[in-house]
Amino acid sequence: KPEMLMELMVMAYKSDDGYEDKEVSESEINNRNVMARCSFHILYNLSCCPGVDNHGNVNPNILRTYIYRLYELSVEHHRTQVVDMMVGSLLGNLPRNDSYPQSVLGEIVEELKSDSVDEHIRIKIFNSRGVTTRAFAEGGNQERSLVALFKSYRDKVRFKYPRLAKIFTNLMREYEHYANHEDYIAQLEDLEY
């Protein structure tokens, strides 16, 4: 429920106006700090997306309703400065299966027209890769396969959802940069042996 997510956001992030209860005991401050850290940890590690079933199918109505309700709650709870980050992270968690990128993702991105949401989608997708290992002097082959994957995503949406296409283009550029860097590292490793 978006209300539960907003509760975590309220505990993890200060309000837009910076207002905090001034008259609280030291133990209450310590409790709030612990709750803030725990809430932030939960939010940061959230790997699901609303409206997605156990098979990776997305219900567009549930997802859209959830996202827009989260925006309403952010106004009520004075957390409008962090809601884009959370929405971007949620949308970045959509399953990258055969139907990816889902049309609802493109629709929401185009409706919101938020550079901040777009950037947090990109960050979430990029960070979802995790740590990589590679063979000696392998170079940037892993990254180039990701460039090709994101190019295929971009090509699917480029005319209908230009903002989403831009996210995929930025991911392509980022992985191309890392591919070139890994090629350089491989050349150095090759010279050493």
Task: Map each language-model feature to its residues.
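Residue at a conserved register position within TPR or TPR-like alpha-solenoid repeats
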Residues: 157-158, 175
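Non-catalytic all-alpha helical scaffold/repeat segments
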Residues: 1-129, 192
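Short, charged, amphipathic alpha-helical segments
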Residues: 164-174
